[in-house]
Each structure stands twice: as structure tokens, then as C-alpha cells.
Amino acid sequence: MSETQSDPIDVSKFKNGDDVHFDYNSTTNDQTINSTNVQKKKKKKKSKNKHKGSPNVEATLNDPDVEYPTSRVIKQAPNGDVIIESLDEPSDAHTKSVTANIWDNATLEEQENLKAFWESLDEAQKIELVKIDKKSIMDIFKNESKTVNTSNNHQNNSNTQGGSTSTSGGALNGSSTNVNIPGAPSNSSNGACTCSYCGRKNNFIEDELENIYDNHFDDIIDFIHEVRDINDLNALPGLLFGGFHMLEEEHKLQKRQQKYKYKQERDAHHDHHNHEPGHICSDTGSSGDYDGSTQQDQQHQYEHEIEHAFQEDEHEDECGHKNDHSHSHSHSHTENHNHSHSYDPNHNHSHSHFQYDQIEELNNEDELSQEAVLQKSLDDELNKELGDESNNNQSSIATKEQRVFHKLLDPKLFEALENLDFEKMKDTPANNHSAHILEKAGSLRDIIRDLHKADKVELEKGMAFLQNMGKIFSSDMSNAMNHDTLNDQISNGLSSFAEDLLKNDGNSFIDMMESLSESRTAREDLLKEKFDKEPSAAWIDEDDHTKSDTDISIPKPDLHQVQELEEELNDEYDEVDEDDDEGEEEGEEEEEELDDEEFEEDEEEDASDTESEISEEEKMQEIRRLFLIQVIKLFQERLKNAYKEKLSQDRTRTLIEELEAEENAKKEREMKKLRQKEKAKEKKRLQQLAKEEERRKKEEEQKAKEEELKQKQEALRAEQRRKKEEAKQKREEEKRKRIEELKRKELEHQKRLEAQRKKEEETKKLKDEKKKKIEEERKQKEEEKRQKELQKKLVEEERSKSAKKQDHKETGSSEDISQLSRDLENARLGQNFNIPSPVVPDTLLAQPQEPRVKSPTKNHILDQLYLAKPRSLSNSTNSTPQINNVTPGYIPDLSSNSMLPSVLSPSGHNILPNNGNVNNQAVPSPWSSQAFNANTQAPPVYQPQLSSNAFSPFNSSLSQNSLSSNANENLNTNPLNTTGFNEPFATAAQPSSVWNPGATSRNNSIWSNSPNVASNSTLWGNSVPAPPVGAAVGGNPNSLDSDLIQAAAYQAFQFLQNSNQLEFGVAPSLKLFQTAKTILSNQGLTLNQFLTSCRNTGSLSGYGFDFIYDDFGTVTHIKASSTNIPQQPPHNNVNTQSINSLGLGNAAVNDNESSLLNTLSDINNNPNSFSNGVRGLWN
């Protein structure tokens, strides 16, 4: 027996799986040592000896639905299986057999599940499960035999004391016989034996089973159908779960019947319950301790417990019957019902209180305790009836026996015997003896089970059996017998094959078949030898009430025989008590040996031919039961396999569903991650869109701002254009006013011309007078000529240069005009020296009259004035009427006049080689569509024009005739910067008028004078006396600086042009400025001074500059050009005459001076006529 059964484990040592206890037997320790030794070997031997320890055991789970315990103890069963027990509850000392069937250990819930599974099957599947065939049944027998032999082998190996091995078989007639097989090996029951004897024995058993199956198949099937109709598929689960016992419905039906009968009997014999209990309480040495009243109270207590059990059964059966047992009694004793007496082991006080308390303490379950109470109560009732049967009259025997049968038929007795756990009772040494007694009475289960089928004849046989029992245990004999002996006799008499079948699942029958085949002859001889002997004092087996005749009477044994039987039983039970500690299996073997001995004794005393027939009948009954058990096991195995297959399929399906669910969850997580990623991408995209939208809004705002700024600029430019338009309109309005003013002046001029013509007519008369004075004037001019020699030498070189380019085909009128001018100057000089001027020739006086004949009747200048447009000022053109040189004496205050520009040369001589005159041959009139080129130097007021492009506001044609000047060398030329008025003192050689488009010279203006100087027909009125020789006229001190800057600017422009730095023929203003400043080596020169000097048209450098402006009026580019023109050589053949000979008096000079000043005043009053100096009148 293993150590796990003898040494219980203290559960309090282990908490929540903190420690795991491994419990091994001796064989396991040896295996551990062997495995340790194997590890110490070399590596090449490890693979060979690696699996020498324990063989591979297939893992099976008795209850796969139970959760694996966290707090557990791992054990090893005797057969090597691993047992895992939970520590939540105290572990039972008894280890469950691993070979136990799943149906025996199944809970109610599992059985319900199996029933539900059976009901869920269709009819074809049910028929397939309950199909009976020979091969399946024989396979179950073989497998069972192998399993039992293997289990016995392990038990024998684990047994340390090692008792002698014997072959025990179930005895016929309910007794056992110890048959020692001569020559048989000690391990004949060991399935591991491979000897020829054991093989022949196994083959013999199988052959005998096959013969029994073939010969008695119909009888077996009929018996199976008697127990349960296996064709009733709906009722089969009850057969499978309940074995061949009665089903729950049959139990309930019989319970209700028996309870009703029991209640009637109890009411009828209520007075009998108050008597002294009939059970024998023969306490050695203390037989008088319990009086009648105490025993009566105990009996009442037993009856109350039985009634309580019946009431519970009635409640379960849903019957409305209630216990109307209304007798009242009170227990006055204070004795504890759970008390335990310290009796001697041989002195067992077995009254019902004591046994009930022991059973309750062992089982700790209400149901099991109640069943134990019922068992003991019914035993007491049986003993009581047996005692009463010997004391009462013979007339009441039938009634008493009837009550005993009712007690035996009580279903509570059956249930109590069915549910008693003798193994648990054996584990406790104090209850071990009582457990053996109750276990020997286990055959009552079969008796009670078969009583409901008994007919009248069998009931009569049972009555005879009870009578014989009453004779054996008579009152005379029971007083001398102790209580233990009586219990032993009862327990030995109630042993049967059903006990072996129920306890060992038919294993005892297999052993019986082995002994039966070997000892049949020996037993027959033994029966024949003892047949003639006198039968000993023995009783008939409990099955005799169903098989024996009513005439069989058992003689009453004498006291000597009873004492001998008592001694033998006491000796046997002493041996049993000593062997209880060796384990369950050894105790069973001792019991079987005891049964065999008793069987031999019974056979020696009671052997007869009738017993042989009875034994054969009982053997067939056991065979039927054995095959019924095997059939039920077959059905159970099939149903178990089908249920396991269904569970496997369900679990596989559940696993697949869980895997699919896990896969779906995984996919769902992946999809969730993908959705999160998509969401993140969408969020990022939305953020990018938001940023893009914000950027677009900023761009739109920026564009809006730019558009707004552009609109503002556009509005500003529109405003500027509007202002320009207004200024243009204002200029046009001013131009219109000037045109009107010019018309008015033209009318006045016409009036003056008319007056002048009248004066000319008068002057004709005077010329005749002056002819006489010509000679005198010539002389005077010669003298002046000598005085001017020095002055002429200074300008001779310049005149020689200009003379080369001068056209020698000048007309005679131009020479006369030059001569006239020299005569006028001589006359002026003569007047200064008080020299009489000669008379002007008549030819000169007659010339101015020709243009008047050609004058048209209509003035065309008005149309040109209306069509003329304002042009930008050009520094290379002169758009204003030129003012010819006049004598400083005519304008004595000209240098200090604020109306004159500040560009008059301070030097006392002419800078240009043409003596201050500029010949600009390519300048159109101010009313043409060409740009105006400004002369860098205007001719002196007192000097006639030499160029052929002299300005004439009434003539757009150009004349190739130039005027030659014979100015005095001792006079300073005072040019005007911007004004270009023609010489008002025109000589007779140039008599062209305003309406003469074919004139040879353009120097006639609207103020053009007549050739007759003496007529004083000029714009400025009469002439004034000439200043003395050498008198200086005020000039501009900055004229030389402007000339230097213009010359440097022109050189810089030429440098940029040669180095290909020009842009479309023009130079950038800043680059030109930097280059000019480098040339001048003047770092203090500013851009404003540079531009002002370049705009200075009164400079004598002879260079012109064109400017290009941007939209804001800033100079961006400048173009430079040269305007130097050679001067005309002087004509010295003009006679020097006195001013007086020309008939010019002071009045005439004063009138001319007044007219010139008025004209300059008009020009100065116009604010738009000047830009960076004095601008032209129509610019």
C-alpha cells in the first residue's frame, strides 16, 4: 500500500501554490536513483539509457472540465499514473483507482450532459450504440482481464510485506473456498506472466466464455431484457448510468408503495414500538448498564430518524402525504448522541446510537448519514423481530415475518446500502471493524433488489428462511453469545457473488472461473466425502429464500457448535483487524480467504445433490449478470466514445472559432491600425490642405495688397495724368492766350508797319540829302577803320577759319546789309566821337521796298500756331527768336537787368571763332514737327545774324544767306542763353517782311525792321547812343564752369561710345556723371550741378545734350552732341559812316531800346517760358 494512503498531507502547509509536494513510492525513488546514475554516464551512452526509467504512460484526464488547481499536490499512483489533487479541501486518504470508470465518478451535471447528449442523437445513431455483438463483448472481457492483471501486478509490487499469493474465486451458494492450485506459480494472477501455463489458462477462460456466450446467448439476452428493455432507446440512459440496478423512476414507485405499507404497519403496531429493543446488546461485564427506559428512548429516536428520512423521500416524490405519527415522548437523559466509548477492541458496543455517530463522523454528509441510520435501524428491526419471534406465540409469526419483509423491501435500506462508502470507513482505524461488518452484509442489496420480483412460492421460501434464522438466533442462545459474534455470523451469512460483482466489476467472477475449471473434480469429491457426515451448525445462504423448498428445515444447532463457530469467527476477525493496516487490497484478500474457509466448512456440513443443482443455477445467474455488466460497459464505452468525440468536435470547433475570433480580432486590430494610419494620413492631408489654404489666403491677401497698392499707384498715376492734363490744358489755355496776344501784337505791328512805311517814304527824301554827306562818312569810317585795326586782328584767325567754310556766292544784298550794319556801327561810333556820318546810298534804301510788293494779303501763321504742340526742351536747338547784337549803349542796364539770363560771358572778347555768331543750318522753325536744337550761344543783341536758320515766327523756310557782321573789336559780345530774337536793326540789304516766304534770310521776325535804319522802324523803338569803346557788359561768372563741365561730359560720352558702353546710342546718366567727374578730378561735383550745367544752353562750349526721363521725371540717359560752326570772315569794304549820316537820332535809339525792353518784359512775365534759364516764347 502506498505511502499516500497512510500519511495524510497537511493542507495548511501549502498556500496558493507556494510549494508543490511530490510524493513517490519506493519504486519511484529507485527510478530517480537510476536516472541520476544515467546522467553521470558518458554522452554516447546517454541516448541508449535515457528512457530506462519509467515507461511512457499515456495521459488521460478523468474530468477534463475541471479547472487545473493552483494549490495542488502531485502524487504518483501505484500503476505509475500522475494524480493531481487540489489543496482547497483536505485531501482524502483514500486514493481513487485510476481504472475507475468515468460513469462511476461522474457528477450529476455530467450525467445530465450525457443524457442530453443521448437524447440529441438520432434513432440510427442510438441503434448503432446499443448494438450487441459477440466480438465487442469478448474484447471487453479480454481488455478487462489485462487491466485487472496489470493492476494486481502493481499492487503486488507495492506491497512491502509480500503475503502468499493465492487464487480465489467466487464460491457457489454464497460462500468462498480457498483453493490452492498445486504447481501454480506465485504470480498466476499477474498478467505479465508469459509462461505456457498462464497462456493456456487464459485461452481456456476465453474459450469457456465463448462457449457460454454461444450456448446461453438467448438466456443472457432475455435476462438483459428483463432488467431493462434495451430496445427502448429513450430509457437506455438510465440503464447506462444506473447499471443493472433499478432506475430512479422504479425507485420512486417502490418507495411510495413501501412507505404506504410501512405507515399502515406502524400505525397498527404502534404499541409494539414502546417495547424494549430486540437487538442483542450483550456487553461483557456491563450488561445491566442500560435499563429498559433508556433502550426505549433509543428505539424512539431510531424511529424518529426513520420517519424523518421517509418524510424527505415523500418530499422528493412530491407526495402530499405527511407523517401523522403523533405520539409524544421526551428524552430525559442528557447523554450525548455523538459520544464515543473507549471500549476494548474485542468489546464493541454496537447499539444504533453508537454506530450512527461513527458513520456520521466518517462521511460528514447528511444523505450518507441518513442512509447509514436507515441501515442500522432496519438491522435493529430485523434483530428485534427475530427476538420477538422466539418469545411470542406461534400465531403471530406470520404477521411478524410480514413486517420483516416490509422492512427488507424498504427502498431506504437499498439506498443506504448502495451509497455506503466502506473505503472511507476503513481508512479510520476506529471504524474499521464496523465497516467490515457492514460490508459483509452487502449481499442484502441483491436480496432486496430481487424481492420485488418474487412470487408467492418464493415468499413462502423466504418465510421458512426467516423461521430458521429465528431458531438459530433464539433467545436462549443469544444471551450466551456476545454482540460481535452475532454480527460476524450475520455478515458472513450475507456474502454473495453480487458483492464481488459490484465491488470488483466482475473480477471475482473471473477468478472464480479460473478456480472452477481446475477444482471442479476436487470439489465434487469433497462434497461426496462430507455428504454422509452430520451437517454442522450453519445457515443457508440468503439466496436460499428464492431457490430452496419450503420443506427444508434446518436443525437447531446446539450450544457447543455455536461456541465453536464463535471462536473460529473471533479468530478470523482478529486476523482481519491485524491486517487492516496493510491496505485495502490485502484486507480484501484476507476476506476472500475467510470466505473460502467458511465455504469449505459449509460444504463439509451441508453438501448434497440439491446444493450442487443450486450452485449451477446460481452460477448461470452470475454469468447472466456478468454478461449484463459487460453489455452495459460496452454501451457505456460506446456512449463515452461518442460523447468524447462530440466533445472533441465541439472543442475543435470552439478552438477553430476561437482561432477565427483571434484571427478576426487580429485582423480587426490590423484594420484598426490601418484606419488609424489612414486617419493620421487624412489628418496630415487636412493639415497640409489647411496650410495650403492658409498659404493661398496669404497669397490672396498679398495679391490683394499688391492689387490695392497697384490700384493706389494707378490712382496716383491717374492723378498725375489728370494733373498733367490739367497742366496741359492750362498750358494750351495760356498758349491760346499768347496766340491772342500775338494777334493783338500783330495788329499793332501792322499798324506800326504802316507807320513805318510812312516813315520810309519820308526817309526817301532824307536819303537824297544824305547822299551828299556820303563822302564825309567814308572818311570818317576810314578813321574808324584804323581805330579798329587792333580789334580786327584779334578775331582775324577766327574769321579766316570760318571764311573757308563760308559760301563765296553770297548775294549783293547780304553784303549791302553787312555794309549797312558796319555803317550803322560806324555811325554809332562816329556819334560817340562826334563824327558826321556819311549819307546812305540810294541802292540800300531801295532794297527794303521789294518785300512789301510781295507780301500776301493773308497771314498763314495763325493756322500754324493753332496746330503747334509744346515740345520738350532740347539743349541742342534754339526755339526762341534770336536777338541780334546791339550796342551796349542801347541797353545800358542790360547787365543788371533781372530779366536777362546769367550766362553772359564775362570775358572782353568772343570765345567762338565766328565772333559769337552761330550758324545752325538744320534747325527748323518752332512750328515744325522736329525737335528744337538750342544754340549754345545766342548772337549778340547788337550784331546781325550770320546763320541761315535765323528764327522767324512767320516763315518756316530756311535761307542760305547769312549776315556778315563787322563788329568793332573793342566791344564785348554779350550773348543771351535762351533768347534768340533776330536783329531788330535790319539793314537795307535784307528787306524781307513777315509775308514774304521767299525771303533769302530767316532773320526777319514779326518785329522785322526796314532796311532803312534811319527810319527807326524796330520793335524796340529808337536807338540809343552806343557806349564808349571798351565798355564791358555784365556777364555770368559760372559760364566757364559750365563750359568745362559740358566739355568733360562730351569727352566722357565719347569715351563710353568708344568703349561700347552706350545703351541704344545713349549713356546712363550716373555712369556719364562718374566718368565726367573722374575727368575733371573734382570730387565735390554733384549730380545736380552736373545736370544743371548740361542743361545750360547759354554755354560757349558748343556742345548740346539730350535728356531721357522716366515716369517720375528723373533723368536716366543723356546723349551728347557737338554744335560748333565756323564764323563768316569780316567784310572790310563797307564804308564807315557816321550814325548821323543814316539819319538815326537819339529819339530813334530810345524808341528801339524801349521796344526791346518791353519785349523782354513780356517774355519774363510768362512763367512757363523758362526752364533752367530763359526759354523760348513758344516752347
UniProtKB/Swiss-Prot annotation:
Keyword match Transcription: no
Biased composition (Basic residues): 39-53
Biased composition, class Acidic residues, residue ranges: 564-616
Biased composition (Polar residues): 24-38
One matching Pfam family: NST1
Biased composition (Low complexity): 149-178, 282-299, 957-977
Domain of life: Eukaryota
Key words, A-Z: Coiled coil, Cytoplasm, Stress response
Coiled-coil segments on the chain, per record: 648-810
Keyword presence, Transport: no
Annotated Basic and acidic residues bias: 10-22, 262-278, 300-347, 663-681, 690-812
GO CC terms, sorted: cytoplasm
Intracellular or extracellular location(s): Cytoplasm
TM ranges: none
Residue ranges of the region described as Disordered: 1-64, 147-189, 255-351, 537-619, 660-819, 928-947, 957-997
Main location: cytoplasm
PANTHER family assigned to the protein according to its UniProt record, in alphabetical order: LD36051P, STRESS RESPONSE PROTEIN NST1-RELATED
Chain's role: May act as a negative regulator of salt tolerance.
Family note: Belongs to the NST1 family.
Protein name: Stress response protein NST1
Protein source organism: Debaryomyces hansenii (strain ATCC 36239 / CBS 767 / BCRC 21394 / JCM 1990 / NBRC 0083 / IGC 2968) (Yeast)
